[in-house]
Amino acid sequence: MEKQLPISVWPEWKIIEKIGEGSFGKVYKAQRIVQGKTFYSAIKVITIPSSQGELSSVRSENPDEQSVKEYFHSLVEDCIQEVSTMEYFRGNSHVVSVEDYKVVEYLDDIGWDIYIRMEYLTGFLDYCMGKELTEKEVIRLGIDLCKALEYCQKH
């Protein structure tokens, strides 16, 4: 499945497949080719509000459009704060690195798309697929996980 990002986001990156989806957005595997070399990134797309139903629900509870926009904009700001925190961890070998992000506001309605480009890593289930982990590998993974948690807690 080839999907294009809006041209203004990262024109050099092409989405090649969806690799995940959750309540906070969709994650795609993207590639760019530079001088014959292929590079991969994961691009998370978070849409605020997440659906037309969510927008309608908030509109029904708020007296005016400005209040609705302020509510959803505060969610965008929270998301940007989380991305900024993740950027702080860049370079730590135990935490996924954020490479770039962009926020695109809708012109025709209340809403934003937040694009977060991160290093592309093999998912744990894919890593384990079709092989049995040795005791040594399990211990190494456990230690790496503990180091990541320790680093996050300290910072």
Predicted features and spans:
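Conserved N-lobe ATP-binding subsite of Hanks-type protein kinase domains
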Residues: K26
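Short beta-strand micro-motifs within the conserved protein kinase catalytic domain, predominantly
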Residues: S97-W112
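AlphaC helix of the protein kinase catalytic domain
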Residues: F124-T134
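Activation segment signature within eukaryotic-like protein kinase domains
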Residues: L141-G142
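Protein kinase catalytic-loop region centered on the HRD/HxD motif
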Residues: K147-H155
